[in-house]
Structure formats: C-alpha cells, structure tokens
A protein has these predicted regions:
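SAM-dependent Rossmann-like transferase core, predominantly class I methyltransferases
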Residues: 1-17, 166-233
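Conserved SAM/SAH cofactor-binding pocket of Class I
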Residues: 2-78, 217-306
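Class I S-adenosylmethionine-dependent transferase superfamily signal
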Residues: 36, 123-124, 248, 324, ...
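Intrinsically disordered, low-complexity terminal tails and inter-domain linkers enriched
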Residues: 64, 72-99, 324
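Conserved proline-anchored active-site loop of SAM-dependent methyltransferases
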Residues: 101-113, 237-245, 301-313
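A short glycine-rich, Lys/Arg-flanked "PGG" loop and its adjoining helix->strand segment in the class I
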Residues: 117-129, 320-330
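Conserved beta-strand signature within the Rossmann-like core of class I S-adenosyl-L-methionine
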Residues: 130-138, 331-338
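Class I S-adenosyl-L-methionine
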Residues: 152-196, 340-371
Length: 371
C-alpha cells in the first residue's frame, strides 16, 4: 500500500546518513517507520499513533523488525525507545547523548492545528541536542507549518515537492536541528465546566480528543436523553473527554460507568475528569480498537450510549452497535445520537427490539432494547 502524500514525502526526503533512533507518526499503516527500520538495520524506531485501530494495522503490516520497530498507542511521545510505554507531555531531553536522532511527522492541511502545535513541541522535546525534526504537509502553498517550525528552530530548511511522476506537487517538507531545549513549554490541555440537571461538573480535554475544549452538541443531546437508574452499569462508547460518563455517574446512587475509546488521550481525559469530580470509584475507562469493553464486563451493562463520528461511512457506528449488543444484559437499552437517524433505525432493528427515535436539540437519539 502506498503511503499518503505527506508520509511519502518524508520517505523521499529522509537523511542520507544512518539514523540510530527515530520517532515518527503515521497517517496510514506505518510505512515511514517500516522503511526507516528496513533501510538502517542498526536503527531503533518508535511509531506513535493516537488511534488503537491504526496501531493494530501498523503492527500487522510492518511487524517489529526483530524488536527494532515498536508501534505505540499512548497519550504522548515516549522520551526514548527504551521508554516507549511511558510518554509524558512535558518530558524534555537536554543533552546530546539521550533522546531521538530523528523525529518525522507527516501532517495534513486539514488537520487539527492545536494538535500539530503540541506534537511539534513534544517532538522537539524528545530530540537529543543535534537531533533533526522533519515535518511534511500535503499543501504546496503552506505557510502555517513553516511559521510553527520557525518558532522552534533558528534555521528551517524547506523542500517543496517536485513530483517525480510529473503530477501535481504533493506538498512541502520542513526540517530543523535542535541546538537547545525550548525556553518555554506551552500546555495545550484544558479543563472546562458544564452542568447537568443542576450539577456542576468539570471535564478535561486535550488536542486530538473529540470536541476539544467544549461539550459537543450531540453529546449534550445524549446526556439529556439518557436516564440511568440508581445502581445501573453504563457503557460510554467513544467516551472522548468523558462528559457523558461523568454526567451518567453523577445522576444517581451507585451508578458506575465504563468508557471505551480508540484514542489513548480520550481514556486519559476521562480518568482525569473522574478524579476532578471525585468519581474515580465510579468511572473507569479502557483503550480499544473495536469499541468492546473488557471481556469480563461484557453482558453486564444496563445502558450503552454512543455518539459515533460521521467520517467513517458508518463503519465506527457499526462497531458501536456490535459492542453495545455484546455489552448489554438482556433488556438493556442502547442510545445512539445522530443527525441522520435512518441508517440507525434500520441497522438497530436487526439487533435490538423496540427501536425508536426522538428529537433532542436538533439531533435524533435512536433507542433500542436488547432482546
């Protein structure tokens, strides 16, 4: 499989000299990471992704090159290949003998700007002194990414694509060499408050998490439509920043909630939000590529709720419905919020009984009951 344009640009513009340690992200299935590991047999490569499904696909396609390539799905970049399971947002390498030799980030012009800013800062932090950062963008007219690089490095190289196939130029690659740690470390996570039936709750959000810095209108509609009873066990499918989980847990006595998400930052934010609201004993969360909760919890939930994204042509919505079916006990209720209820009414009718839809705040909440 050919890499997306921005990732292919980095592949074509890697340094000539061997790289000992490399940190990279991927927009597909780790093609850049796999090529680095293959080109330099003595290299150690970490491929970082914020999507558990992409992580699974990368491992399946690229393998591990005898342990030299590790694919990780954690909230932040690791400090080094030896610390690839313990990333932290503020970790800084300040010497020539630690950290990565190369960081390479493929990005898209339509990506989330705040996430790109944070990943650039983290990548700079993870480089050793003298290490090199490369970032590509699939927009030949880009200036925004160039400006961000000039905030980090005194000198930035620019390579504008000359498509070898003779087609339309694919984008730009920027490069910078770390000569000192950053003087200022900006934080991009945030806390925001919202009310549910008179209860003030606080949530935590980070770039890359759905609806960063605010409660999504669809999520608000779902919160208004759900009615967990005391003692219920609730599954929050695609928990994001955890606002639905927190509202459900605060609704009544003994309500427990488990959130699942494919983004490790979403899991982190949900757990941090639970701690902020003294709900850590009632709200848990786990990372998953298929929306399923842990095996020991399946078949135990009274209510499953979800706000699936629209960008996947209902693939993720289908995963949510399958997960709800596996997670609910007989008679348990599933709620899905959407602006386009027809697909849900048809698909949920194949799995659940008593399927119906109600309009809440210009959204539709589709309800079903497990047979």
């Amino acid at each position: 499989m050919r890499a997306p344009d921005s990732e292919q640009l980095l592949i074509e513009n890697l340094p000539d000299e061997p790289v000992g340690t490399a940190l990279c992200t991927t927009r597909a299935r780790g093609q850049l990471a796999g090529l680095i590991a293959a080109r330099w047999p003595d290299s150690r490569v970490v491929c970082h992704t914020l999507d558990a499904y992409h992580a699974q696909e990368t491992v399946a396609v690229q393998g591990s090159y005898g342990g030299r390539l590790e694919t990780v799905c954690i909230p932040d970049f690791p400090l080094s290949p030896a610390d690839s399971r313990n990333g932290e947002s503020t970790g800084v390498v300040d010497s020539a003998g630690e950290g990565f030799d190369l960081a390479a980030l493929p990005t898209t012009a339509g990506g989330e700007s705040e996430l790109t800013r944070e990943l650039l800062r983290e990548a700079h932090n993870r480089l050793r002194i003298g290490g090199r950062l490369l970032i590509s963008v699939d927009n030949v007219s880009d200036s925004w990414t160039h400006d961000r690089m000039r905030e980090l490095f005194p000198k930035v190289t620019v390579v504008t694509d000359e498509n070898p196939t003779g087609g339309k130029p694919r984008g730009v690659v920027y490069g910078g060499t770390k000569d000192a740690p950053l003087r200022k470390q900006k934080e991009y996570d945030c806390e925001f408050a919202f009310r549910d039936r008179g209860t003030l709750l606080k949530a935590v959000s980070r770039p890359g998490v759905f609806s960063h810095r605010r409660i999504d209108p669809g999520g608000r509609s779902l919160i208004e439509a759900m009615a967990p009873a005391d003692g219920d066990r609730v599954l929050d499918l695609g928990c994001g920043s955890g606002v639905v989980s927190l509202a459900a847990a605060a609704r009544g006595e003994g309500i427990t909630v488990h959130g699942v998400d494919s983004n490790p930052r979403a899991v982190e934010c949900t757990l941090r939000g639970a701690a902020l609201n003294d709900l850590s004993d009632r709200v848990t969360a786990s990372l998953t590529a298929d929306a399923l909760p842990p095996a020991e919890l399946r078949g135990t939930f009274d209510l499953a709720v979800g706000n699936p994204p629209y960008f996947s042509h209902q693939r993720i919505a289908g995963l949510f419905l399958a997960a709800a079916d596996a997670a609910l006990k007989p008679g348990g209720v599933v709620l899905m919020v959407t602006k386009q209820p027809s697909w849900f009414l048809e698909s949920m009718g194949e799995r659940f009984a008593d399927v119906s839809s109600e309009e809440v705040r210009r959204y539709h909440v589709v309800r079903g009951r497990k047979r």
